[in-house]
């Protein structure tokens, strides 16, 4: 079998040296991706296309599908490569190939020709088109918007009968631009923004700020691995996970409610910049869109950018949510994003949309930056290729209950402000307050002879924190959902 890879048009308008470099990199990327399907596969680069030849017919569909997801490819032609003698021979071969496909349809013939011949491309189109029209009674020529377009390519003494054309994702080959670090949360925005930078030729590494235990991290790892495996598997990348619960806890205790969102984002950018510097990455990527939430106003984005010299790229800055969700659906991350948890207790009740620099800096003076340094130092860095095995581990299930027994105590894990605003009172059972960000250090001090029923507003944080406690060896935890 044979495939002809057509280059993304922006590659073809580059200078000769740049174009050759891009084609060379794309050829290497194709080899890296396809070697898993057929080790005997041949990839040959030319000035205006790349040729892929494979022997294992059983892998035809898999190879074709993989090619449509490699950045830098405009479209793929699946072809049958045969010799020919003259125009009539071209017609006979086209008739044998396309007869069934053209019956009862309108059609036109389009020919591309390279090399020296006694005929022009238009002459071949007329000759073959006329012959097909005469020999297939139910077919009819229609030059504008036909049902079927018969594509032929003539190169020297070879005829390429095009059996199918398949669109690629375009863009630049990965590796033609410098590395970036994507701040990935597993939601719609960060997945799409990561894809957009891969499509633009960047090797995308991933940085995840864990706010909710193993279950959330496993979910985000699956998203990152999916994106890499589907669009960027030609290159090795890193997945860096930072336990940000201590930072969130410090913010909730030390920072004014209205400033929390901007301060949290500033802390994330500081941490990600340290990771980027450690690995020689040139830019950060976020999924922020202008005005989508309170921290994404121009004033707040400028204050967030100010904490780091690292370039921050925001490919979705002008996109609306519907457009982002449509893109997520196209690339296959929509289902991941819809099931990714959101966290109660991490969001300000009355966030500022126009933060003042002096006020933000004053709030941050109360923050213990050694906590930030520590979580960055302890960040977990893995090769994304290892995630496939790691994410197969089963997360321990935690029982969810709607009632309670004599030995049960409800543990309200909301933030202090939320507890003050809406105190939880349940008749017939004790309620103890312990904010979620203190569970890792304070839960062991509680009476372990009791069964603790974790509760929060949405039920997401309580489940994730219960999973975390179970992982730490505490079997006396359940989730309370009345």
From Swiss-Prot:
Q: Where in the cell is it found?
A: Cytoplasm
One of the GO biological process terms:
thiazole biosynthetic process
Task: Specify the Rhodanese domain's residue ranges.
Answer: 404-482
Cite the PROSITE patterns for this sequence: RHODANESE_3 (PS50206), THUMP (PS51165)
Give the annotated active site: 456
Q: Name one GO molecular function term.
A: tRNA-uracil-4 sulfurtransferase activity
Q: Name one Pfam family in it.
A: ThiI
EC number of this enzyme: 2.8.1.4
Q: What is its main location?
A: cytoplasm
Signal peptide positions are none
- Ranges for domain THUMP come to 61-165
Pathway linked to the protein: Cofactor biosynthesis; thiamine diphosphate biosynthesis
Q: Which GO terms describe its cellular component?
A: cytosol
Q: Where does ATP bind?
A: 183-184, 265, 287, 296
Q: Which UniProt keywords apply?
A: ATP-binding, Cytoplasm, Disulfide bond, Nucleotide-binding, Redox-active center, RNA-binding, Thiamine biosynthesis, Transferase, tRNA-binding
Catalytic activity from the UniProt record: [ThiI sulfur-carrier protein]-S-sulfanyl-L-cysteine + a uridine in tRNA + 2 reduced [2Fe-2S]-[ferredoxin] + ATP + H(+) = [ThiI sulfur-carrier protein]-L-cysteine + a 4-thiouridine in tRNA + 2 oxidized [2Fe-2S]-[ferredoxin] + AMP + diphosphate; [ThiS sulfur-carrier protein]-C-terminal Gly-Gly-AMP + S-sulfanyl-L-cysteinyl-[cysteine desulfurase] + AH2 = [ThiS sulfur-carrier protein]-C-terminal-Gly-aminoethanethioate + L-cysteinyl-[cysteine desulfurase] + A + AMP + 2 H(+)
What is the superkingdom listed in this entry's lineage?
Bacteria
The disulfide bridges present are 344-456
Family affiliation: Belongs to the ThiI family.
Q: Which NCBIfam families match?
A: ThiI_C_thiazole, tRNA uracil 4-sulfurtransferase ThiI
Q: What does this protein do?
A: Catalyzes the ATP-dependent transfer of a sulfur to tRNA to produce 4-thiouridine in position 8 of tRNAs, which functions as a near-UV photosensor. Also catalyzes the transfer of sulfur to the sulfur carrier protein ThiS, forming ThiS-thiocarboxylate. This is a step in the synthesis of thiazole, in the thiamine biosynthesis pathway. The sulfur is donated as persulfide by IscS.
Protein name in UniProt: tRNA sulfurtransferase
What species is this protein from?
Salmonella schwarzengrund (strain CVM19633)
